[in-house]
Amino acid sequence: MGAVRTKELLRSLEILGVTEHRFLDGPVDVDMDAHLDEAGAAQVLAIVAEVQPDSILTFGPDGMTGHQAHMDVCRWATEAFEAAGKPGARLYYATQTPEFVAEVVPQVVQFNIFRPGTPPVTPRAELGIDFVAEGEVLDLKLASLEAHESQIEGLLEVFGEQGLGRFLRDESFRDAGRKEG
């Protein structure tokens, strides 16, 4: 499955026009309870130290869905931010609004996307980033996500493209820190 997911990701990035991307070493297809290879932590640290991003957007400690690999990614990104983030850089954790949870989560229960206690919920007024994709931006996002056929085909069958657009239009992040210095 790893080769399939890699091909899908590359297609998705092509749709978005992303020309710079780095793959981490280690397995790319693990089950929901499996940890990622810890070598990834050092790789993320090296990338943050080299790139010195203004902002890092990642999963929160709950992994958004409760999937262990997502929680590992959060830990790695947070540790890299703390160790090598440039002064003034911001760290953001993915979250959902109460409105999203009320409207969308009941519709996706059958897909086991969210484990108990997830997704995290943050009131819209407390978000650090609150972006709602519309029009051409939403169309581009959907085209990019539809390239991930192995992960999204069931949702697309149930919701159709318009319903999927509602499910995926919000990008919500809570402020998780600012690098001092």
Where are these regions (language model features)?
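The feature marks non-catalytic terminal segments
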Residues: 86-181
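Active-site beta-strand->loop->alpha-helix modules in alpha/beta enzyme cores, enriched
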Residues: 1-87, 163-165
